[in-house]
Amino acid sequence: MRAIILAAGRGSRMGNLTDDHPKCLTQFAGRTLLDWQLEAIRAAEIRDIAVVRGYRAETINPAGCIWFENPQWASTNMVSTLACASQWLQRDDCIVSYSDIVYHPKIVQQLALHPGEIVISYDKAWLPLWSERFENPLDDAETFRLQNNGQLRSIGANTRTVTDIEGQYMGLLKISPNGWQQIETLLEKLSKEKRNHLDMTSLLQLLLEEGTEINTVPTHGRWCEVDSETDLRLYEHMLHHSDWAHDWRWEKTAVTA
């Protein structure tokens, strides 16, 4: 098992915090976002880690990682960044992580152990967090519907009702070589322009429409997404509450507890 962190973007909604470095190097709760991701992945006993760089690539140099580059980071989207790591995706099962999220190592462990060619983690306890982040949580949330067997049924559409959202996609997934082959086959059918602008949830929905099975792993909190300076302020405040369900931090001796 390997891990790939998608860190090519600037994070324009972070304001001037990303003038000099990419979003993943934003300081949060005493570490950078990237540090939190690397620590969680390593605590889940995954040692081979690659980072896909783009904006201000020279600033991303943590020890023990290899690099892939997306030189077109400014004109492409997340799926194009993922494809820059195809060398790994073709050979081994890979945990894929966005670079603007933090999460408990146990979520990574559960994802790594779950069967399936394409598997995604999702948060069943998303609504309280989104209600804190947004005046109307539905302004940002997207549909997430499951089949009776727990596989993904649909994802990524706008909605005006909470009943269309059975969980929040987290930006954390696992892809096997066979799963990546299915993704590559789909991407070959798309125009270059559509490929360049394809986001991850749109890719997942297209895969579903092609008949691809996507398995899911539920979690209840213990992660969060940092998308703005407002998020940073909110989370720094919530970390003072011992009962905050989305506190992702862990004691190194208690990861497997």
Sequence positions of predicted segments:
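Short, well-ordered beta-strand micro-motif
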Residues: Q27, W88, R145, K174-S176, ...
